[in-house]
Amino acid sequence: MKKFVAIAGNIGVGKSTLVKMLCDQMGWDPFYEPVTENPYLADFYQNMSAWAFHSQVFFLAHRLRSHFGLAQNPNSVIQDRSVYEDAEIFANNLYQQGNIQDRDYKTYRELYETAVQFLPPPDLVIYLRASVPTLLNRINSRGRDYERKIAPEYLKNLNDLYESWIENFTLCPVLAVPADDLDYVAHSGHLRLIVKKVDDKLTGKEEVVFEPEEMARAAED
């Protein structure tokens, strides 16, 4: 039976890497964040408060279209970043920073919440949870120049929004992965453990956690 899984998490946590590795293991199709030419982006960086709303609506429209297409795809797919994160994390963060006005944010939320009602949810959201030091370490390791200026405070704000969102998310099951403790690139055992937990959630097991003892054993593989 076809499955639709989305991987969520902060900048630098390792979403794209896990998408590829899980798809290689499970024989599923990966779907990465599309490189989309946002016509508002240059204006946004010049004047965030004037163009944040327009930019976020553009991104939301593309993310909604991608989500709907993946839900209709006959093959099992794993998505790099969900539609929910656009609204619940990034647009919310811009609003909290004062870059989206109250009435614009209310309109954005109404648009998002109405659209989401008509979207079939994923079968599972995998949430990669990591501390700011882990995020910074991974960001530095991958060496993208445009990410080197990301402040720890910005990552912390996003982490706080992620935790609030995932705690209240009820549209589909969630598997929280302790990314501080699991290095699925360095340890094949960690990857196999994640695959097992994903299978557990997709087959209906409700309480799926990563026990310290099994993570330690998996690191030895």
Residues covered by each model-derived region:
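Conserved substrate/cofactor phosphate-moiety recognition/catalytic segment
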Residues: 24-62
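A glycine- and Lys/Arg-enriched "phosphate-lid" helix/loop adjacent to the NTP-binding pocket
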Residues: 89-163
